Structure formats: structure tokens, C-alpha cells
Amino acid sequence: GETIISKNKKPMQGALQDFTDQGWKVTNILNSMNLESMLRALKPHTPNGSVWAGALSYDLVQWTQPILLQHPPAEGEILAILWLVDSWDESEVIIPEVANTVRVEGEKSSHSDAEHAEIVKKIKQSITAGELYQLNFGRTWTGPLKEDPSTIFHRLAMNNPAPFSGYIEAADLGIALASSSPEILLETKDGEVMTAPIKGTRPRGSDPDQESLLRRDLVHDRKERAEHRMLVDLERNDLGIVAQPGSVIQSRFDVEAYANVQHLVSQITGELDDKKDGIDALQALFPGGSITGCPKTVVCAAIDEIEQKPRSFWTGSMGWIDVHTGDSTWNIMIRTLEARYSPEGWQGTVVAGGGITIESNPEAEVAEAIWKAAALRRACGWLNPEAISLPKGELGIYPLYLEQQPFIPEQRFDLNIAFIDNLDSFSHNIIHALKSFGCDVDVLDGRGGITEIDHDAVVIGPGPGRPEISPLSMHAASLDIPVLGICLGHQAIGINRGMKLIESPLGPVHGVPSNIISNGNGLLREGKHVMTRYNSLILSGNGEIEVTSTDETGVLPMEIRDGDTYGVQFHPESIGSPNGMLVFAEFLKRASHC
């Protein structure tokens, strides 16, 4: 479907309330055009030292991404709940003993297993067509609850402990959220910013040997590693929106073991730009890339089209923020029960899913979603205790080798670069790379009109879809100044020189380091290079341009050159491109001599 890009939206409305003898009373109405401005509007109402704590629904995506939802929440639906906290105690809480689960009938699923598998196939077709790289689809289970949601949360805390768990209940609104989340979206403190995305999953083993085998299988699984690499590149990009150039790094890479599952987890850190704070960071990162996909803007629109309903609080965030300092901590609400109260009692909603890539097996994705939801469904009483029995284990962390290695530029270039942003989730990684070499970078909207480019050089950025959707990219491909096209930009250059763009006959490749064979006439020196690819479409045929690098088969053009115009069908900025920064260095060196 079509991604509807819009920056002209209805404002989000917030109601400030005070608690009185008659209950909660509205004292002020706040209207804001995005999440950041809504939080800043709370400053006059927030004493120094106090924080706001609560939950943000995923559907606030309407005010963090430039899209219009086709299936928005109903008018007046609760999108966020925040309480002003003046003081708090830190203490050890003893979880009360919880009775055995009460079996409850009446659970319903939003999709049958067959329907779920067909959606996976449909997403893979979109990946093949070059519309996106990866998408996280959620399947929903709903049913009545015969226990208070707080009891279910205590059961989860006992049976499925997780580091970013939390419980929220707004009795007057009839909403309760019981989150047993292992994932942090964002932490900001004293000018530092951190996120720790999770992607890649295996169950726990029934014994230490099986546990080790499953962990090793996870670490060496091509699909899981590619998906995780893609997510790390995405989150580096999102942190790059608010961080100082050169400060964003992958600081940790581990397998983390929780009660029933093992995950690949990376920690990505950065230093906030002097003009940015934790509110800006939340605006940039929300919702988390691990539960949307890539490129984020396009997949958020695609999720809306495929799931055909609001997500509500699932994959939103629970946490707190100091609106004066910007210090904050937010989780991602996966492994979360959303409960709503009505005269008939509590009704529960549980959602689970996974990231769909070109290498996803539909039946395996269905099975993964089912066992991810099993612990919550069992805690709600919707599954028999013996159903979908999963091995359990102690929490553990197993460090892995970091792919991203530090890079210190040997040369700086006093160049003014125009960067054309084509709605990709890696754009800011490229911008940071250029700035790390001393360049000034002006960012131009690839979906905007053709504008004059009076710069020393231009970099046409990657993005979903075909390059023809960006008239500015096609225009820049013909300029008589140094040009570097990356992925979509590379394709724009090839089309401009008479080549055709087709679906790759060897299939899509996303997040996978690939061997690139160069003849030495382009930006790469002669020989073999390892670079990460994110492409489904490929240039084909003869054109008025030289192919300077191919894939290992010698069939697919990976690098092209026409004078001072260069195109690369790989991503030099990725953590999976060990010497990718040298590509930028060589281009800038040549541009500085023009």
C-alpha cells in the first residue's frame, strides 16, 4: 500500500487533572503537535525534582513519525497515562504468594495459524519488491479475566521475572497494564543516552548442554544475526538524531537469558548534542525499532495496513521522565497484559509476534509468536498449566564479540555536502560518518521538490522503494559535481545512465555482510571486500557507466562509476561493513580535489 507522508496533523490533546474530594478534576487542556512538545508543555506544571511516570501507547506513533494512520484509535481513546510524582521510596518488595491460575474459557485469537502464515508470506512479497526490509507483525489474543490484573502481574513476576517489569492501574479509567518486559527503549542521564534493542530469540534448554547448543545456534543463525544487525543500524540512526557526531557506538553485544527465552541484545550509547535532551531522545526513538521494523517510517505505515487496528499500549513504553533535566528511563511494553474494566468485569489483551524478514519461515514465525505469548496467556488462565510447556532457567548474560570497531579519521575535509534523505532508517549513520570527517552536511528531503544544490558534493541516501519516487534523487544523479549514491542513490545513478532496475534474480539481501569484488576503478581498491547489503532491487543491463565492483557471482553490479559520480549497492555505514568508512574517506578525498 501507499505510505501517506504528512506533517499537517491534528494536534494531540492532553488533560491535566488534580485529585479532589470528588475525584479527578480537569484543570487544563494541552494541545501539541508532537510528543516532544506535549512533554515540554508540562514544564510549567512540574516542580523541580518531580518526575512524570506512567505509560505511553504505541499509537502515539502518529506524533513521532510523519504518517497518517488508516486505522487510528477511536476519538477520545486514552493514548497515555502519566502521574506527577513528587517523591518516592526505593525498597525491596516481597511478592505475595499467588494462588494457582484459575482456568478461564472464552479466549479468542485475532488470526488463525493459517491466516498468520499468509500474512508472513505477504510481508515477504513486499520485501522482495523493495518496499521494506523487515516488519514486526503482532497477533492478538483476548479473553475475560477472573482475577485482578495485579494478581496476574505478581504471577508473572514470580514465573517470568524481567528487568523492566512494571504495573500500572488507573482505576478511574478502567485500565491496568502488567508488563514483564526484558527490553529498555531509552535511558538518558547527565547528557548520556542509551538504548538496548533485543532481536533474535531461542527458548531455554532443558539442561546445560541443550542450553549451550541453542545459544550457539542463535549466535550463528544467519537470519537472526541479519535481523539484529539491521536493528542495531536502525537504533544507531535514531540515536544519531539527538547525539553528537561520532559519539554513537555499539558498546555491548550479548546473549541474555531470561526465564523462558534467550535473546540477542546490543547496547548502543551516545552523548547528547548540546541542544538536545531526553525529551528529544524520546521523540526520536519512540516507538522502538525492535517492535516496528525497518525502514521505520514505512513499516509503521505498513503495520497499520496489515494489522488493521490500533495497537494501544502493546509495544508502547512504560517509564518516567524529568521534564526539566530530560533524565528518563522507558521500557518497551512487550510481554504485556492490557486489561480493561467493564460492567462484565476485566477483559484482557495479549499480543505477541516477531520480526519478518526475507528469510522468515511462515510456520516458524507462527510457532514463535505462540510460545512468546504462552506465559502471559497461561498467567491469565487462558491456557492449561501443562499447555506449551517451556523449559525455565536462571537469568544470565553471555558477552559476544562486537562487530562495530572504533574508527578515527586520519584526514578531515572542509566540504559542504548535500545529503538527500530518502526516508531510510540509516540516514543519520551516513550523516554522522560525513560529519566525523569534518564536513558540513545539509539534509534535503528526498520526497520534496527539486531544489538547487550548490554544494561541494552530494550524497544520495538509501531508502525504500524505487528511486523514481524521489525526483530530487533522480535530479542529483545527473549533476556535474561529485556525487555518491548509496543503495537507492546508486540505483538512481544507474537508471540515469540507461541501466534497468529489477528484482534481484538471486533474491533480496538485508543485513547480511557480503563479499564485494572490485576491479579498483571505483572507490574500493582492487580485491575482495566485506560490506553489508540492504537491497531487494538491483541494476541490470548495459548503460553509459562502468561497473567497478560485483558480487561474488560476477553478475550483480555492486559499484558503478561515471567520472566523479559513484554508486554503491552496499551500506558502508553499517556495523557489518568493517572498512566502510574508507569508502567515505576516498570519496571525500576525490571530491576535495575537484
Predicted regions and their residues:
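Short glycine-/acidic-enriched loop or helix-start segments at secondary-structure transitions
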Residues: Q62-W63, P144-L145, I241, H324, ...
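Extended alpha-helical targeting/anchoring segments
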Residues: G1-P409
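Short, glycine/acidic-enriched loop or turn micro-motifs at the edges of active sites
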Residues: R236, D424-S425, S574
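Short beta->alpha connector loops at strand-helix junctions that form conserved
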Residues: S251-R252, D445, G461, E503-L506
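Short, hydrophobic alpha-helical segments
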Residues: R377-C380, N384, N496-R497, F587-C594
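Gly/Ser/Thr-rich beta-alpha loop segments that engage phosphate groups in nucleotides
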Residues: L56, L132, I291, P295, ...
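Flexible gly/pro-rich beta->alpha loop and the following alpha-helix that scaffold active-site loops
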Residues: N416-I420, D424-I486, Q491, R497
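Amide-donor transfer/coupling interface in amidating biosynthetic enzymes
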Residues: Q404-A418, G448-D454, E468-L484, I502-C594
